[in-house]
C-alpha cells in the first residue's frame, strides 16, 4: 500500500479506492469500507470518524487510532472583481500553496497546485522565481479541493486542472492518486475529460501516464521550435519537441474524440509573430490539437512584455485559417495575482529553481 505517511496515522484524504481498500486490509476489515469512507469524505464532507454512523463503534475507534483526516488551513481568501477566487492554503510544515476558482457561465474550474514552488525555471513564470521546496502529498492536493468546496455553492466545481504551482508530472504518484479520487464514483464523480493534468513536457512521465490514466492532457508549449523553447522552458533541453510531440500524440491515439491542449503564452516580440504561427502549424500537423493562447500576465521583475491584443487575435486567426482550433484565454483574477503565471504562495526552505530529473 502506498501510504501518505511513513509513520504514525495514515492520512486518508488522498488515498484512491484501491489504496484505501489496501489500508482496510491491514485492519482486517472488508474492502468495501473504502467505498463508505470515500463517500463520507468526498460526497458528504464529513471528516470526523465519530460522525460516520454506518461504521461500527469498534471500527471508528480503530480509525481514530490508525488514521486521520486533515484539511489544510486557509491563510488567505481573496475574490477578484471578475468573480475569480483565490485561496492561499497553508500546509502543516508552513509552506503555502495557492488554488484558484474561475467561474464561467456553464462551468466552474478549480486550478490546484501539485508542488510547493516549482523546479522548472520557466523564464516567464512567477512561480519558478520563488524556488522549490517539495512535492505535495495526495492528501494536500485533494485537500485544496475540499477547502474550495467549503467556500463555494454545492456543484460549483465542474472541472479540476493541475495548473497551479508546480510540475504535476514530477510528483507523479500523488497526482495520479488525487486524479483518481476526483473521477471515482465514490469520490468527486467528475468525468475524466473534466480533470486535466498540465505539464511542461516531462516525456518519460507522459509515456507512463498512458499506462495508468486517461484524464485530459495539456502541455505548456510556448514555442514552435527547440531553440526558442530551450530559452523559455529549460526542460526542453532534455525533452525536445522531437520526443515531446510523439509522446503526446501517442497518449490520445486510442482515446476517441480526444485532443491535446497546447498552452502558448504570448510574449511581445518573442514568440508571437506570423512566422511563429506558421512554424506552429507545421509542428502540430496530424496531432488532434487545440491551442490555447494566453496573454502574458506581468509580475514584478518579469523580463517579458505582453503581446498587444490585436497581435494575439492575428496569431489566433493564422491558426484558425489553416484548420487548427485556437482559443484566447480570458485573463481572470489578475487583480489578486491569481492569473496564469502569477501564483507564488509562500515557500519554506526553497531551493533555487532548476529542472529536476524526470520522474
Swiss-Prot record:
**GO CC terms, sorted:** cytoplasm
Q: Does this entry carry the keyword Transferase? A: yes
Locate the residues binding S-adenosyl-L-methionine: 166-167, 198, 220-222, 297
Cellular location(s): Cytoplasm
| Cofactor annotation | [4Fe-4S] cluster
BP terms from Gene Ontology: rRNA base methylation; tRNA methylation
Amino-acid biosynthesis as UniProt keyword: no
Catalytic activity reported: adenosine(2503) in 23S rRNA + 2 reduced [2Fe-2S]-[ferredoxin] + 2 S-adenosyl-L-methionine = 2-methyladenosine(2503) in 23S rRNA + 5'-deoxyadenosine + L-methionine + 2 oxidized [2Fe-2S]-[ferredoxin] + S-adenosyl-L-homocysteine; adenosine(37) in tRNA + 2 reduced [2Fe-2S]-[ferredoxin] + 2 S-adenosyl-L-methionine = 2-methyladenosine(37) in tRNA + 5'-deoxyadenosine + L-methionine + 2 oxidized [2Fe-2S]-[ferredoxin] + S-adenosyl-L-homocysteine
- A Pfam family annotated for this chain is RlmN_N
**Residues annotated as the enzyme's active site:** 98, 340
- Residues that coordinate or bind [4Fe-4S] cluster: 118, 122, 125
- Cysteines joined through disulfide linkages: 111-340
What UniProt keywords apply to this chain's record, in alphabetical order?
4Fe-4S, Cytoplasm, Disulfide bond, Iron, Iron-sulfur, Metal-binding, Methyltransferase, rRNA processing, S-adenosyl-L-methionine, Transferase, tRNA processing
Q: How is the cofactor bound?
A: Binds 1 [4Fe-4S] cluster. The cluster is coordinated with 3 cysteines and an exchangeable S-adenosyl-L-methionine.
Task: Say where the protein is mainly found.
Answer: cytoplasm
EC number of the protein: 2.1.1.192
Q: What else is known?
A: Reaction proceeds by a ping-pong mechanism involving intermediate methylation of a conserved cysteine residue.
Q: Which PANTHER family match?
A: 23S RRNA METHYLTRANSFERASE (PTHR30544), RADICAL SAM CORE DOMAIN-CONTAINING PROTEIN (PTHR30544:SF5)
Q: Which family does it belong to?
A: Belongs to the radical SAM superfamily. RlmN family.
Task: Indicate what this protein is called per its UniProt record.
Answer: Dual-specificity RNA methyltransferase RlmN
Species of origin reads Halorhodospira halophila (strain DSM 244 / SL1)
Gene it is expressed from: rlmN
Amino acid at each position: 500500500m502506498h501510504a501518505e505517511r511513513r509513520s504514525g496515522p495514515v492520512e486518508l484524504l488522498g488515498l484512491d479506492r484501491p489504496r484505501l481498500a489496501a489500508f482496510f486490509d491491514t485492519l482486517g476489515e472488508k474492502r468495501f469500507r473504502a467505498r463508505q469512507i470515500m463517500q463520507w469524505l468526498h460526497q458528504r464532507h464529513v471528516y470526523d470518524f465519530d460522525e460516520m454512523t454506518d461504521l461500527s463503534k469498534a471500527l471508528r475507534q480503530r480509525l481514530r487510532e490508525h488514521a486521520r483526516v486533515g484539511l489544510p488551513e486557509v491563510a488567505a481568501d481573496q475574490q477578484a472583481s471578475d468573480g475569480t477566487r483565490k485561496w492561499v492554503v497553508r500546509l502543516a510544515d508552513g509552506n503555502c500553496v495557492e488554488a484558484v476558482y474561475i467561474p464561467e457561465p456553464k462551468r466552474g474550474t478549480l486550478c490546484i497546485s501539485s508542488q510547493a514552488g516549482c523546479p522548472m525555471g520557466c523564464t516567464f513564470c512567477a512561480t519558478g522565481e520563488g524556488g522549490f521546496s517539495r512535492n505535495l502529498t495526495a492528501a494536500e492536493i485533494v485537500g485544496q479541493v475540499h477547502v474550495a468546496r467549503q467556500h463555494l455553492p454545492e456543484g460549483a466545481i465542474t472541472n479540476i486542472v493541475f495548473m497551479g504551482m508546480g510540475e504535476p508530472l514530477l510528483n507523479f504518484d500523488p497526482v495520479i492518486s488525487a486524479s483518481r479520487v476526483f473521477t471515482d464514483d465514490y469520490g468527486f464523480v467528475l468525468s475524466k475529460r473534466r480533470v486535466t493534468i498540465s505539464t511542461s513536457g516531462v516525456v518519460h512521465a507522459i509515456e507512463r501516464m498512458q499506462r495508468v490514466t486517461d484524464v485530459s492532457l495539456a502541455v505548456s508549449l510556448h514555442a514552435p521550435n527547440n531553440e526558442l523553447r530551450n530559452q523559455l522552458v529549460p526542460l526542453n533541453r532534455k525533452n525536445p519537441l522531437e520526443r515531446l510531440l510523439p509522446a503526446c500524440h501517442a497518449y490520445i491515439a486510442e482515446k476517441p474524440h480526444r485532443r491535446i491542449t497546447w498552452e502558448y503564452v504570448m510574449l511581445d516580440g518573442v514568440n508571437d509573430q506570423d512566422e511563429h504561427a506558421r512554424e506552429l502549424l507545421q509542428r502540430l500537423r496530424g496531432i488532434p490539437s487545440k491551442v490555447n493562447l494566453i496573454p502574458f500576465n506581468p509580475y514584478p521583475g518579469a523580463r517579458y512584455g505582453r503581446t498587444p491584443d490585436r497581435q494575439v487575435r492575428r496569431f489566433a486567426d493564422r491558426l484558425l485559417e489553416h484548420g487548427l482550433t485556437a482559443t484566447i484565454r480570458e485573463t481572470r483574477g489578475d487583480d489578486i495575482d491569481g492569473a496564469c503565471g502569477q501564483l507564488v504562495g509562500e515557500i519554506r526552505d526553497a531551493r533555487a529553481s532548476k529542472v529536476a530529473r524526470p520522474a
